[in-house]
């Protein structure tokens, strides 16, 4: 029916808008995640976990993912401003 088609179109449009907003804020969310993880890494180091335990390795992997998101997001922002 026409009503269902309109609802579907609205949902797709809303999904695109949410996706754009999430993409725009991705670098900030990644920075917040990094700031949340730093105390954990510091505690692990104090506890002698600097021997590359699984937990520390996982946290470092997450930091690298977040850093890549920040880099990608900032490149997009700079490209739009040029």
Where are these regions (language model features)?
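Long, amphipathic alpha-helical coiled-coil segments characteristic
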Residues: 1-24, 28-31, 53-81
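C-terminal helical "lid" subdomain and adjoining coupling/linker elements of P-loop NTPases
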Residues: 33-36
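Hydrophobic, amphipathic alpha-helical faces that serve as interaction scaffolds
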Residues: 39-49
């Amino acid at each position: 029916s026409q009503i269902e088609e309109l609802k579907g179109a609205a949902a797709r449009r809303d999904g695109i808008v949410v996706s754009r907003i999430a993409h725009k804020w991705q670098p900030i969310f990644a920075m917040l995640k990094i700031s949340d993880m730093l105390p954990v890494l510091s505690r692990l180091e104090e506890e002698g976990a600097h021997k590359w335990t699984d937990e520390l390795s996982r946290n470092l992997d997450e930091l690298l993912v977040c850093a890549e998101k920040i880099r990608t997001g900032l490149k997009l922002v700079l490209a739009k401003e040029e």
